[in-house]
Structures are given as structure tokens and as C-alpha cells.
Amino acid sequence: MKTFVEIVDVYARQILDSRGNPTVEVEVELEDGTVGRAAVPSGASTGIFEAVELRDNDKSRYMGKSVEKAVENVNEIIAEELVGLNVFDQVALDKIMIELDGTDNKGKLGANAMLGVSLACARAAAEYLGISLYQYIGGVNAKVLPVPMMNIMNGGSHADNNVDLQEFMIMPAGAKSFSHALRMCAEIYHTLKNILKDKGLSTGVGDEGGFAPNLESNEEAIQVIIEAVEKAGYKPGEEVFIALDPASSEFFNTETNKYELKGEGRELTPAEMVEYYAKLVEKYPIISIEDGMAEEDWDGWKLMTEKLGGKIQLVGDDLFVTNTKRLSMGIERKVANSILIKLNQIGTLTETLNTIEMAERAGYTAVVSHRSGETEDTTIADLVVAVNAGQIKTGAPARTERVAKYNQLLRIEEELNAMGEYRGLKAFYNIRK
């Protein structure tokens, strides 16, 4: 087998994401004509510590959201450095781009430019070898199929309603396999739609395919989901669990140091906010809370971890932004017990893999995630299996840009056959009871 395969072309273009906003797509061509292609996602609620997504800010084009500059950076700066190099040397390719950029936050070339190239290189290498992307990234040990963390109800900045918490999700940890888990989720999703219809509530879907009905409170959203789980014939707390993503940085007032639950007309101190979650956890089968406290409220995070870290999964998204520096601060301070992994928060495959490795060494789980602005690219489905992460967050079983990831996981499950493993509740090795 050849160990050096030359990159002969790196080319980027502007395409549209699932919200109709421009994003970057990159193609990497190899000496034998093999092409690897990758498209980059984009978030709505973004952490302030995320790597920079370069946009043109020219109001006369796509409301200022075009990415021509990022595309130009690939075609004129990055391509020049990578053409002639070995596609199999992922670490070196990513390192060259990081050095070319030279900033802490990918502000010069843009994380969207760099990630497109990084992923297209990996895909080209896998294509050349004639193997699946998860096998190329993860090797022979890549075999764990993830428990879906499926967003079926929205509030916060993903919706226009009275619900403050951003995402209400189901996790079919009691399923026998990934395909069984997906079926359970789809059945619950359709049942939920019918329940909302019967109540005369909206069944329009948000950016990630979840419903955004105008409910009275956060608790009502949980109750309606539990009703859907039971009506679909499943047992809450045994087969299906609830996960929340409050995205609390969005409703944290840094001046008053309070969490403003506007839908409920309440302002809570960090300690009261932790108490609020503790009561929900006691009352409902909640297994995971993501970004329960704001990205800069380290004291609040500490309180929440001390109170709930032994009972449920506490995921840092805005807190950690897929960044080893931020994650090591969290590990040191004993804050959270899980990290959300979003490729575009950091900007290269190598750095993403380093973050996942650091999390797992510290006993934290890694939940591989989509963004609210997605494309038909299915890299995250391969990534979650490649690193045996055991959990994926990629939206409702609706909207093709979400379903594409689930369908890719069905193919991977089929390919792995008896080798594949669906861990269910064992995926939560971070909950130290």
C-alpha cells in the first residue's frame, strides 16, 4: 500500500446551509483523481470562546453572511501550501493550516475555511483507500454506535415561544441497537406531533426539526414529551430518558449575575438555578443537562456539578467549545462530566480528536453534535463511531440535513454487523453514582 499520496488540488466554493445561509464546501483531489468533499456547518447560539466563522459582512450580499473571503482563503492561501503534500498526514496538514492562520481563534483564515479543508482531506484519504470514513479515522477499534440525543421540542433562541430552555430531547438508552433506537425516536416524534395537534398547538418545526409549540412553561414541555413516550408504548426512565439543553448563557444576565426565565417571569441566582434543575431531575427521568449554567459562570457550574454530577450527565458546550484549553480548566476545577463536540467550534479534525481524547482520559463523555445550520454532509456520523463516543446529537427525525446523519449511522451499523455495539446506558460511564 502506498504511504504517500499527493494532494493535487484544493478547491472551495460557497454553498447554502439548511437555513439558507452561505457556508463553505471544499474538494480535495488526489494524484489518481480521487476527490474528497466536505461541507461546514454553522451555529445559531454560539459560545463566545468559539473559533471564528469568517463571514464577509457585506450587507448587499446574503444579508452580510456570504463566505467569499473564507472561500478565497482556501483557494489562494491554503491550497498553495497543501498541494504536493501527503493526504495521509492529517496531523501535519492541520498543523500547517493552524500555523498559516497564526491566531488563537482561527480569526485570519476562518475556522469554516480550515475545517472544510481538514475534513475534505480525511474524506479523500478514506476514498483513496476504499474504506469508510469512520474506519479511516478510528481504525479497527471503531465499533460503538451512538445513543441518539434527539431534539424534539424547542424553546429559547431556537423558537418564538414562552419556553426559556432551548432544547428538550429524548435518549432511547434502553434500545437494543441503533436502528431500534432510531425507530423508537421516530415513533415518539410522530406521537408527539399528534398530541400537539390534538391540543390545537403548532406543529411547525424549528431549525433542527423539533416542534416549537407555545407552551405555558418549561415543565409543560417535559410533561408533553413524557406523554408522547408513553403513548408510543415506551417506558420513561427505563427505555427512554429526557435530556435538556437550556443554553443558559442565552438567558444569563452578566450584570445582575442572575438567570432570567422570562417565560416564567422569574429571576434566579446561580444557586436557585441549580435547585431548579435538581427539582426537575427528582421529578422526571432526566439523564443529561447541557449548558445548564452560563459559559462564564464557573461558580454556578461548580455548584451544579457538586449537586448533580453523581446523578446525571452534565455537558459543557458553550463552556468548553471543543477546546482543550477550556476543557483542561474544567477538568482541573472538577466542573461538568461531559463535553459536546462540534467540529466547527475548533476548526480542524486533529484538534477535535485531541479534545475527545482529553475528555475520555479524564472520565468525561464526549457527545458528538451537529449545528443548527447544517448541510447534507454526514461526517459527524462517521466521527462518533470512529472515536466510540457513544452519543450523538443531530436533531429530530425530520429535515433531510438531520436525517442524513441517522441514515449514515444505519449504513455503518449494517457494515459493522456483529462487530457493532450499541451501549445504551453504558454510554454514560461518567455518572459516578
Curated annotation (Swiss-Prot):
List of residues binding (2R)-2-phosphoglycerate: 166, 342, 371-372, 393
Entries under SMART domains matching the protein: Enolase_C, Enolase_N
Pathway terms, separated by semicolons: Carbohydrate degradation; glycolysis; pyruvate from D-glyceraldehyde 3-phosphate: step 4/5
EC id: 4.2.1.11
Enzyme class: lyase
Keyword Magnesium tagged: yes
GO biological process: glycolytic process
Keywords: Cytoplasm, Glycolysis, Lyase, Magnesium, Metal-binding, Secreted
InterPro entries noted in UniProt: Enolase, Enolase-like_C_sf, Enolase-like_N, Enolase_C, Enolase_CS, Enolase_N
Active-site residue list: 208, 342
Domain of life of the organism encoding this protein: Bacteria
Cofactor note: Binds a second Mg(2+) ion via substrate during catalysis.
Subcellular compartments: Cytoplasm; Secreted; Cell surface
PANTHER family xrefs: ENOLASE
Described function: Catalyzes the reversible conversion of 2-phosphoglycerate (2-PG) into phosphoenolpyruvate (PEP). It is essential for the degradation of carbohydrates via glycolysis.
Protein name as it appears in the record: Enolase
Gene name of this polypeptide: eno
